[in-house]
Amino acid sequence: MVADAVAKVCGSEAIKANLRRSWGVLSADIEATGLMLMSNLFTLRPDTKTYFTRLGDVQKGKANSKLRGHAITLTYALNNFVDSLDDPSRLKCVVEKFAVNHINRKISGDAFGAIVEPMKETLKARMGNYYSDDVAGAWAALVGVVQAAL
């Protein structure tokens, strides 16, 4: 199942190009991107806050050092994923390692999928006129790799 999701992403030049192009914009400020993504998650899917109680008051945003740390760690994981697009076995490995942390917190593939819409909104905000549905679809496909690992 993970292998199929990896093959879909790594086997598509269009998906890889959209991920790389958009990551070029998102990674210009890793911390701000991560915090925006988390804020969008909590705004669009307030039910997901229950997975993050260990972080304290997530409404404090950047002032919450635990949330800030999570946001930075998350975006470095995304960076790892994008860096691994030309090596399917490497992408599979880094995604499976990432998945372990979520499995330990009892986050299912379906629950993890809640990040797709917040990611779309983050992409729109950060990319402006460069945003497209194809870019959002590429990120949804990458999220699908994580979901398959969960």
From Swiss-Prot:
Stretches assigned to coiled coil: none
Residue numbers binding heme b: H102
UniProtKB keywords: Heme, Iron, Metal-binding, Oxygen transport, Transport
Pfam families, per the entry: Globin (PF00042)
Homology family: Belongs to the globin family.
Transmembrane segments: none
Domain Globin: residue ranges: 10-150
One GO MF term: oxygen carrier activity
Modification Blocked amino end (Val), positions: V2
Record-linked InterPro entries: Globin (IPR000971), Globin-like_OT (IPR050532), Globin-like_sf (IPR009050), Globin/Proto (IPR012292), Mb-like_M (IPR044399)
Protein name, per record: Globin-2 A chain
Organism, as annotated: Anadara inaequivalvis (Inequivalve ark)
Subunit structure: Heterotetramer of two alpha chains and two beta chains.
